[in-house]
Amino acid sequence: MPRTLTIQRSTVPSAERANYRARLRVLRSHYSAANCRFWVFEESSLPGAFIEFTEADSEEALTVAHANAPHRILDPSRVYQEVEL
């Protein structure tokens, strides 16, 4: 079964960064407990522009993890599957 991934982009004003980071810690804990991997990157040339990746071993696991997440992503139906090369 191919691994699956969702992507979420966010622009966070500097005044909201502490709240955003706290939310990310909660999400990381949730996805870890759901056997998913969760990464967040910030664009180096545009402070406050973030991209979040959530990965699971199956689309079902990823869908369930998003459905039960404490914070919703904008479009959980946009799921990417790993391509075999």
What are the language-model segments listed below?
Residues M1-L85:
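Short S/T/G/P-rich N-terminal loop/turn motif that feeds into the first structured element of a domain
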